[in-house]
């Protein structure tokens, strides 16, 4: 049994987890998450400098609690991993420096993990996760991507958002409607009392320079603007803004766009399994719609556990364990952090000469 201590500090969650695996069975011994939502709520979004300072403040206590809850001593840990890219650079440094310091102090090997690979790996804690090639819809506050993953975990991005990520659109529309931060849960809650067919909002597409549209790519800024114009028009008419109906209509359109393009991509690439991960993957409308529409095309949907959809260190540990399983190179202790790094570049984190 290999045991990994993992650290996640890429944005506004401070998390430490102890995970292990025996073959294809992955186990969480502890997964402590300290959220900063209340600290950033009054600003309507994450403030990078504030987030980094909170990580510095919280990480020692989160680390101590994770070890205590797991009942595993740090001397019994086999590997230490942390998120190193992409994310907020100041936040990433807190976790990375802590992890590498622990490695030097306790003579442990280090793995720097790509944050999106971590989200992909959250599915390893679900029952009957796909062992063969599959398509992942990774949908969160900072990313909306379609990623093909083969049985060796080699990753290829097939689609992406050209502007706002879906989660970012939820936050912005939530703020526009006067809802609390984060916008995703707030919109989902109030949308339950609304009519999802009340308003005909646009499903925006990205033009292809060769003609037509890019089949697997996303754009949510136009949808956000359409909601803004709708609210302005209702206000000009002197009417009350039907917030539940607007929220429900917005939620429906986002889900439809994500589901339609995911299933199209899976069918075109002859992939029989779709994996849904990331913070927005916790949205019940999206989960139900994906399962219902995929079943019509004989595609099986695998959902990340609800408690592992948002940022957490368990998924980072799972990614590390999978790397170790296939004997990928360990990361250099000289490896730094990067605010941006595509998923196709994840393997560079294990090269002898670090990319940053």
Curated annotation (Swiss-Prot):
<feature type="binding site">
    <location>
        <position position="115"/>
    </location>
    <ligand>
        <name>Fe cation</name>
    </ligand>
</feature>
<keyword id="KW-0819">tRNA processing</keyword>
<keyword id="KW-0963">Cytoplasm</keyword>
<dbReference type="GO" id="GO:0005506">
    <property type="term" value="F:iron ion binding"/>
</dbReference>
<feature type="binding site">
    <location>
        <position position="283"/>
    </location>
    <ligand>
        <name>substrate</name>
    </ligand>
</feature>
<feature type="binding site">
    <location>
        <position position="311"/>
    </location>
    <ligand>
        <name>Fe cation</name>
    </ligand>
</feature>
<keyword id="KW-0012">Acyltransferase</keyword>
<dbReference type="GO" id="GO:0005737">
    <property type="term" value="C:cytoplasm"/>
</dbReference>
<dbReference type="Pfam" id="PF00814">
    <property type="entry name" value="TsaD"/>
</dbReference>
<protein>
    <recommendedName>
        <fullName>tRNA N6-adenosine threonylcarbamoyltransferase</fullName>
        <ecNumber>2.3.1.234</ecNumber>
    </recommendedName>
</protein>
<comment type="function">
    <text>Required for the formation of a threonylcarbamoyl group on adenosine at position 37 (t(6)A37) in tRNAs that read codons beginning with adenine. Is involved in the transfer of the threonylcarbamoyl moiety of threonylcarbamoyl-AMP (TC-AMP) to the N6 group of A37, together with TsaE and TsaB. TsaD likely plays a direct catalytic role in this reaction.</text>
</comment>
<dbReference type="InterPro" id="IPR017861">
    <property type="entry name" value="KAE1/TsaD"/>
</dbReference>
<dbReference type="InterPro" id="IPR022450">
    <property type="entry name" value="TsaD"/>
</dbReference>
<dbReference type="InterPro" id="IPR000905">
    <property type="entry name" value="Gcp-like_dom"/>
</dbReference>
<feature type="binding site">
    <location>
        <position position="171"/>
    </location>
    <ligand>
        <name>substrate</name>
    </ligand>
</feature>
<feature type="binding site">
    <location>
        <position position="119"/>
    </location>
    <ligand>
        <name>Fe cation</name>
    </ligand>
</feature>
<keyword id="KW-0808">Transferase</keyword>
<dbReference type="GO" id="GO:0061711">
    <property type="term" value="F:N(6)-L-threonylcarbamoyladenine synthase activity"/>
</dbReference>
<dbReference type="GO" id="GO:0002949">
    <property type="term" value="P:tRNA threonylcarbamoyladenosine modification"/>
</dbReference>
<feature type="binding site">
    <location>
        <position position="184"/>
    </location>
    <ligand>
        <name>substrate</name>
    </ligand>
</feature>
<dbReference type="InterPro" id="IPR043129">
    <property type="entry name" value="ATPase_NBD"/>
</dbReference>
<feature type="binding site">
    <location>
        <begin position="138"/>
        <end position="142"/>
    </location>
    <ligand>
        <name>substrate</name>
    </ligand>
</feature>
<comment type="similarity">
    <text>Belongs to the KAE1 / TsaD family.</text>
</comment>
<keyword id="KW-0479">Metal-binding</keyword>
<keyword id="KW-0408">Iron</keyword>
